[in-house]
């Protein structure tokens, strides 16, 4: 979805790819780490490495911890009920999806004319119309 409006993104869950990507980052890049618990070691390590390379770092989490400020430019907190990571009542990923949608909308609106034109180009490239 982001790529269709001209934002070059990559979703990475593999630890090895996270490590490889961390050496390819620079000040032109942004890294968004997502960890419901705020304790996912691979995500935190990747954010620290990205910060060292000059990338903008953003953490999406439910955990409020001042130590994140040492390597995160932005911390987006979302609310979850206790034990939701076990999926009993509502998926803990739901707030994350909402935040990603908000981010998408913000990026789209930041340069709407250009982003909509790029969206048209990508649809044409896919013969989606």
Placement of each model-derived feature along the sequence:
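Glycine-rich phosphate-binding loops that contact phosphosugars or nucleotide phosphates
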Residues: 1-98, 102-111
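A short, charged, Gly/Pro-tolerant segment at domain boundaries
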Residues: 113-129
């Amino acid at each position: 979805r982001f790529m269709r409006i001209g934002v070059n993104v990559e979703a990475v869950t593999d630890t090895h790819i996270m490590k490889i990507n961390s050496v390819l980052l620079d000040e032109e890049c942004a890294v968004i780490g997502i960890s419901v618990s705020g304790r996912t070691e691979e995500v935190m390590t990747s954010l620290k490495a990205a910060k060292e390379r000059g990338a903008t770092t953003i953490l999406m989490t439910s955990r409020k911890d001042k130590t994140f400020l040492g390597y995160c430019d932005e911390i987006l907190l979302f609310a979850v009920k206790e034990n939701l990571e076990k999926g009993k009542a509502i998926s803990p990923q739901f707030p994350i999806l909402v935040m990603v949608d908000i981010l998408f909308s913000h990026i789209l609106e930041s340069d709407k004319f250009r982003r909509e034109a790029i969206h048209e180009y990508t649809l044409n490239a896919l013969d989606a119309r």
